[in-house]
Amino acid sequence: MSDPLGDMLTRIRNAQRARHAVCVAPASNLRANVLDVLKREGFIRGFSKEELRPGVAQLRIELKYNDGEPVIKEITRVSRPGRRVYSKIKELPRVYAGLGVSILSTPRGVMSDVEARTANVGGEVLCRVF
């Protein structure tokens, strides 16, 4: 798999379109950090890490719906393995005039665009969520 984060985002997108309550993806620290931001911003209900066997784990993602409609309307990968996208804090665009969130990987960890502006730090733009 050349883009593990992109794979997880696609699994979430497909599960929400199929109205599944839970989605499963292989575990990694980056994926868990991105899910933590999605939970803080209210896009998912929660997630947990399940150990399948020693050294192999998966993330169980609890998706969130509002009156039967998915909370996540759009989730897209911005920075890809073949084309990395970096942004300074002053050049960081707002997603749908602040209704959506960009998730960044910064020297201070993975955080939302709002948290990055508060911390005055830029970084790699991983994805956009609306």
UniProtKB/Swiss-Prot annotation:
Keywords, comma-separated and alphabetical: Ribonucleoprotein, Ribosomal protein, RNA-binding, rRNA-binding
Any Gene Ontology biological process: translation
InterPro entries recorded: Ribosomal_uS8 (IPR000630), Ribosomal_uS8_CS (IPR047863), Ribosomal_uS8_sf (IPR035987)
Domain of life of the organism encoding this protein: Bacteria
PROSITE patterns attached to this UniProt entry: RIBOSOMAL_S8
A GO cellular-component term linked to this record: ribonucleoprotein complex
Quaternary state and interactors: Part of the 30S ribosomal subunit. Contacts proteins S5 and S12.
Family under the similarity heading: Belongs to the universal ribosomal protein uS8 family.
PANTHER family (alphabetical): 40S RIBOSOMAL PROTEIN S15A (PTHR11758)
Job description of the protein: One of the primary rRNA binding proteins, it binds directly to 16S rRNA central domain where it helps coordinate assembly of the platform of the 30S subunit.
Name this polypeptide is given: Small ribosomal subunit protein uS8
Organism: Acidiphilium cryptum (strain JF-5)
Gene coding for it: rpsH
